[in-house]
Regions:
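Hydrophobic/aromatic-rich transmembrane helices and adjacent perimembrane loops
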Residues: 10-36
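C-terminal luminal/periplasmic domains and tails of membrane-associated envelope-modifying transferases
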Residues: 83-88, 96-324
Length: 324
């Protein structure tokens, strides 16, 4: 009843913490009910089953939370590889591979990495804000509403619906992808809500000239190994600063290490770099790997045809990626 009165609900699928209140009463009532059974052996069997269920539930709960923690740590390490610094007042919208139930699931880790100190002397005010990816946020982004105000547990935030940056991981196998309204690239696995507001995501809020930040060991853990996502993030950063030569160098490293994209849209920085450097053989290799992802293929075609490249290269790109 107290949970319902404050507008919360119990979700058994996600091991909701709101069941803890009721669990105390249940723990008292169940032994009383079992005590009415006269057969002592049957009582032992029932208690054994209940203890077994409780143990498995706690193990499953711990396993799920450990997996979510690892996934979240990996998410923010990738962000740190991609983004040197975020401007004060940036409003993030994240799409995690795991569920995000509150806005502080985003602004909490973001501020720990980029702006660990409060912006105000007398109360806690983070430098980076966040919005939940839900229908309410989508409506306000469409309506171009301005700055909002929220105070929770004496922490003040000022998210702005006109000042958003979207960070998305479409599925666990995908890398974290920064959405940029100047060139929107969407995974075939992307959430429909992200697709709706992708054209409002402002990558200009990334401060490219700053030094890269290292996430603190607690709570982000040790740095993951440098696999595909590391090279993708560094290539995406190099592309944003216009260093196409560096993108090509990273692409060659990817091929030498035989790394593969699990989400084909992540080839885009390398495709553009190889188009600028007129490396047709690399474009052919990438095209053969991307061929099964029709949406990624279509986006590659559209982007290549708008690039300022030699007509012969554009013709080759059309042949490779623009399948009618």
């Amino acid at each position: 009843m107290p949970v319902i009165l404050v507008g919360r609900s119990v979700d058994f699928k996600s091991f909701s913490r709101y069941t803890l209140i009721a669990s105390i009463g249940t723990a008292l009532i169940l032994p009383l009910i079992v005590s009415f059974i006269s057969n002592l052996k049957l009582q032992d069997i029932i208690f054994s089953i209940l203890i077994g269920i409780a143990s498995l539930t706690h193990y499953a709960n711990g396993f799920v939370k450990a997996s979510e923690t690892q996934s979240t740590q990996n998410f923010w390490w990738q962000v740190s590889w991609r983004i040197p610094q975020l401007g004060v007042g940036t409003t993030l919208i994240t799409h995690y591979a795991v569920a995000a139930e509150e806005d502080y699931f985003t602004w909490g880790p973001a501020n720990l990495i980029y702006h660990p100190e409060s912006e105000h002397e007398k109360y806690v005010q983070p430098a980076i804000y966040a919005l939940l990816l839900d229908e309410n946020t989508i409506e306000k982004v469409f309506a171009r509403e301005g700055q909002d105000y929220s105070e929770r547990r004496s922490i003040r935030t000022y998210p702005n619906y006109r000042n958003i940056l979207i960070l998305t991981q479409p599925r666990p196998e995908s890398c974290v992808q920064v959405i940029d309204l100047r060139q929107v690239e969407l995974s075939s696995y992307e959430d429909e809500r992200v697709k709706q507001i992708a054209s409002y995501s402002e990558a200009d809020q990334i401060e490219l000239s700053d030094t890269f930040q290292t996430p603190p060991l607690i709570p982000f853990g040790i740095e993951p190994e440098h696999g595909w996502c590391y090279y993708y993030q560094k290539a995406s950063y190099a592309r944003q600063v216009g260093d196409w030569e560096q993108v090509s160098v990273l692409g060659d490293a990817v091929f030498n290490l035989e790394l593969q994209a699990q989400d084909q849209i992540e080839w885009m920085p390398f495709i553009q770099a190889y188009a600028y450097s007129e490396n047709i053989s690399r474009l052919q290799e990438i095209a053969s790997m991307m061929s099964k992802d029709k949406l990624a293929f279509q986006q590659a075609c559209q982007i290549l045809l708008t690039m300022q490249i030699e007509s012969s290269i554009k013709s080759q790109a059309d042949r490779l990626f623009c399948i009618q």
